[in-house]
């Protein structure tokens, strides 16, 4: 996948794995990451909660996140969605046809009306996620099910894209069209304005710094300058 992304000279992709210290995602590495692509499967529970929170903070600050296939059950995706992220599924190597439902979206640039993947795992509705900002792709499967397979979100200052294809026993990520979607998605998710760490702060503004003169009235729980409860 990194090789497919690096085929675009505007992208410089490296890899991080579960087995590495801090899963290859220490603070220093995330601070230099514009977009994180996340694929996970049976070891979702092995991902350290502190790393999940670290990634969530970076997304809120403006780092892009692309979640692939079975990553719908990853801790980070469920953390950002706030829903169970459940769905129907079937492993049968059936054909998947992905229809472009938002042809003017940057992620769909150069894709055409639809594209097909000959062998894939079926995902079917209901997909228990929040209503997305945009639905870029809808999948039809040979067995008759349909699925919202390309969804965009914004969490804090970060752009998030969920892309359905990518079962581990099929060569999906070697498909040229899938690779193009991933490169498009990385470019879309990249926040050109840079990180916004101020989104994580909740400043206690004193009366004397109000924009208009005011007189303090009533009781309060907090002392001047106190950070407050979270």
Kindly give the residue locations of the regions a language model identified.
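Catalytic beta-strand/loop cores that center a nucleophilic Ser/Cys/Thr
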Residues: 3-14, 32, 87-162
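Extracellular ligand-binding/catalytic regions of CAZymes and related secreted enzymes
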Residues: 7, 145-147, 154-209
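Stable alpha-helical elements in mature extracytoplasmic
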Residues: 1, 29, 51, 77, ...
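Helical hinge/lid and interdomain linker segments adjacent to catalytic or ligand-binding clefts
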Residues: 1-74
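Solvent-exposed loop/turn segments at secondary-structure junctions
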Residues: 20-23, 41-45, 71-75, 113-114, ...
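A glycine-rich, often tryptophan-bearing local segment used as a flexible ligand/cofactor-contacting loop or short
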Residues: 43-113
């Amino acid at each position: 996948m990194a090789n497919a992304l690096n085929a675009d000279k505007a992208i410089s992709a490296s890899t991080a794995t579960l087995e590495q210290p801090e899963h290859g995602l220490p603070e220093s590495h995330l601070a230099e990451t514009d977009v994180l692509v996340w694929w996970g499967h049976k070891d979702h529970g092995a991902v350290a909660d502190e790393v999940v929170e670290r990634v969530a903070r970076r997304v809120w600050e403006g780092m892009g996140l692309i979640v692939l296939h079975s990553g719908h059950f990853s801790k980070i995706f469920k953390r950002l969605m706030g829903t169970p992220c459940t769905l129907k599924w079937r492993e049968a190597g059936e054909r998947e046809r992905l229809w472009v439902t938002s042809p003017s979206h940057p992620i769909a640039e150069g894709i055409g009306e639809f594209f097909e993947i000959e062998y894939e795992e079926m995902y079917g509705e209901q997909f228990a996620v929040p209503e997305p900002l945009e639905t870029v792709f809808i999948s039809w499967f040979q067995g008759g099910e349909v699925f919202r397979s390309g969804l965009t979100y914004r969490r804090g200052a970060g752009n998030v894209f969920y892309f359905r294809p990518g079962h581990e026993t099929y060569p999906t990520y070697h498909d040229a069209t899938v690779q193009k979607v991933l490169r498009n998605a990385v470019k879309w998710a990249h926040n050109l304005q840079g990180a916004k760490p101020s989104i994580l702060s909740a400043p206690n503004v004193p009366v004397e710094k109000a924009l208009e003169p005011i007189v303090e009235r009533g009781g309060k729980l907090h002392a001047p300058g106190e950070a407050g409860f979270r």
